């Protein structure tokens, strides 16, 4: 079924009348774009969308603030985990190197083995 926003052929295939449902089929892209005036400002001087009521404006501002805070917190967590992991990796490498140095045989053991021959 090939149905898109501007193609009404899918409704006719099902049995409905596309003209009765969605209007005249001769409407093109220009008709859809002419529904909104191009000269209207999209945002007010403070950056909030222009067509909002005062209650909606305060809700929008609070949502934007929540999104900003969550972004900062998530970045803090991501970088904290990254740097903690790097720090633990560096410490584990130094501990492995420390253990490798401790497992070398001492010079006394080598002298004792050579003394037996």
From Swiss-Prot:
Keywords: Membrane, Phosphoprotein, Transmembrane, Transmembrane helix. Coiled coil: none annotated. The chain crosses the membrane at residues 64-84. The modification Phosphoserine is found at residue 106. Its main location: membrane. It is found in: Membrane. It is a single-pass membrane protein. It comes from the Eukaryota. The keyword Phosphoprotein applies. InterPro entries: Reprimo_fam. GO terms for cellular component: membrane. Belongs to the reprimo family. This is Reprimo-like protein. It comes from Mus musculus (Mouse).
């Amino acid at each position: 079924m090939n149905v898109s926003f501007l193609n009404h052929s899918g409704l006719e295939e099902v049995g409905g009348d596309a003209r009765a449902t969605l209007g005249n089929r001769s409407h093109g892209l220009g008709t859809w774009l002419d529904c909104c005036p191009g000269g209207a400002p999209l945002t007010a001087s403070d950056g909030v969308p222009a067509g909002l009521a005062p209650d909606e404006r305060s809700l929008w501002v609070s949502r934007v603030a929540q999104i900003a805070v969550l972004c900062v917190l998530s970045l803090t967590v991501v970088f904290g985990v990254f740097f903690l992991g790097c720090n633990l990796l560096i410490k584990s490498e130094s501990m492995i190197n420390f253990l490798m140095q401790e497992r070398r045989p001492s010079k006394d053991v080598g002298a004792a083995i050579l003394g037996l021959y």
